[in-house]
Amino acid sequence: MISLRSFRPCDWQVITQYQYTNLSQANAVNLIGEFNAPTYQGKFHKLLAIANDTQVVGYVSMIETVEGTVSIGVEVYAPFRRQGFAYAAISQLLTIANACGYHTVSAQVRKDNTPSLALCKKLGFAVVDEAISRRGNPVYNLVKPI
């Protein structure tokens, strides 16, 4: 059963195994505190663990971009990809975003990320334009009304 939940201090091992491999336990626990903050740079923000029963398999995030719109992201850790976790997690995140009063969701996906593009289309996102990301990668900007 897939669920979304806040990261817990005991999740430090998961995030240092799959994502922040150079962090100490203390720094990972501090980072989890930042994950759970309600705002980031003064904007509404949620970063939630994707849990498959008790195992954390990745995370989803949303941050307010403009009034009524949040940008979302998902990361499923490599050993758990291609098992439907991202679809289930984003579906739940869309419900949370709507309950928080947002009516539009945006996402940015690298043009060469075929699985993520297919996922966004399956979830009803539409490409609105193309851009170059802050990291210099060609991306699609997608939106979905909720």
Regions found by a protein language model. Name each.
Residues 6-10, 20-73, 77-79, 145-146:
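Acetyl-CoA-dependent GNAT
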Residues 14, 71, 75, 89, ...:
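Amphipathic alpha-helical recognition patches that constitute DNA-binding helices
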Residues 64-66, 112, 133-135:
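A short beta-turn/loop motif at secondary-structure boundaries
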Residues 1-15:
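A short beta-loop-alpha structural element at the N-terminal edge
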Residues 108-109, 124-141:
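Conserved catalytic-core motifs of GNAT/GCN5-like acyltransferases
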Residues 76, 82-95, 118-122:
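Conserved acetyl-CoA-binding loop-helix of GNAT-fold acetyltransferases
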Residues 14-17, 34, 88, 92, ...:
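Alpha-helical elements of Rossmann-like donor-binding domains used by nucleotide-donor carbohydrate transfer enzymes
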Residues 97-109:
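Conserved GNAT acetyl-CoA-binding A-motif
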